[in-house]
Design a protein with these regions (language model features):
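Alpha/beta-hydrolase-fold enzymes
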Residues: 80-163
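Catalytic histidine-centered segment of alpha/beta-hydrolase-like enzymes
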Residues: 234-248
Length: 272
């Protein structure tokens, strides 16, 4: 899993249930290297997931079929594509995932004022052109209220602070992204690869999600050969808020069905 704030809420519970957890930051973000900072490149981020899989596969306590992926929002979309390319995975959990940028675009546009859309487009184009000239990224907030120039201004976009960092523990958390992402999201459709996912898939869908929408996630899950859909009441960040206990308990139960725990691997080796 990635190390965005509040993912530790799930990581601790998974670890308490007997599962080892490997968490990392995508390049250009958090504690990972890479410049310029705060730049999202979908292919590079998927390559980071692949590197994490390759690293985990070489650890002594990871047996065959001992790797599961967990991703939220954009990372939730990444894990679908990565799982499609890695048929040997044990399972994958996609929580409130970005499944189909084309399907999400009209909803995101409706959440913006015309002036905000114009300003965002101008900033995104300027950022993309500037990158060709080696200029620093033009950053925008990852979330904002309607009328703001931000990556997302849907009604539940601003729930992120309350959900992910309510106590302001993550003082170094950068809530910005290079504006060029606004030109890229509509073409990012990782859910189209769901039919190639051979491992069990748990799709966690928030029924009132106004950011990634439940419909595309359910449709992608139906295309996957071995999928389950967990419906939660609430908006995009509900798995970190009012639906947290329901989400984490269901995810642990799913992992227990499909993923060999680290302590079981150690015990099995001790009996040889």
């Amino acid at each position: 899993m990635t190390k965005e704030p509040a993912s530790d809420l799930f990581a601790r519970r998974f670890n308490d249930a007997g599962f080892a957890v490997l968490a990392f930051d995508h390049r250009h973000f958090g504690e990972s290297g890479g410049t310029p900072r705060q730049v999202v490149r979908f292919g590079e981020q998927r390559a980071d997931w692949q590197a994490a899989i390759d690293f985990a596969a070489g650890l002594p306590d990871v047996g065959p079929g001992g790797i599961s992926l967990w991703g939220f929002s954009l990372a939730g979309g990444h894990v679908l594509r990565v799982a499609a390319d890695n048929p040997g995975l044990a399972s994958v959990i996609a929580q409130s995932p970005v499944v189909d940028g084309r399907a999400l675009a009209p909803n995101a546009l409706r959440a913006m004022t015309p002036l905000a859309l114009l300003r965002l487009t101008g900033r995104a184009v300027a950022d993309a052109l500037g990158s060709l000239l080696g200029r620093p990224p033009l950053l925008i907030p990852t979330a904002g209220v309607r009328g703001a120039v931000a990556s997302l201004t849907t009604p539940d976009a601003m729930d992120g602070d309350r959900a992910l960092d309510p106590d302001h523990r993550y003082t170094d958390w950068e809530q910005t992204v290079a504006a060029r992402i606004a030109l890229q999201m509509g073409g990012y459709r990782p859910g189209l690869h769901a039919s190639r996912i051979r491992c069990p898939l748990l799709m966690v869908v928030c029924d009132q999600d106004r950011s990634t929408l439940p419909g595309p996630s359910v449709a992608a899950a139906r295309r996957a050969p071995a999928s389950e859909v967990l419906h939660l009441e609430g908006r995009h960040y509900a798995p970190f808020l009012e639906a947290h206990e329901e989400a984490v308990e269901a995810e642990i139960a799913f992992l227990r069905k499909h993923l060999v725990r680290a302590d079981v691997v150690r015990e099995g080796r001790g009996r040889r």
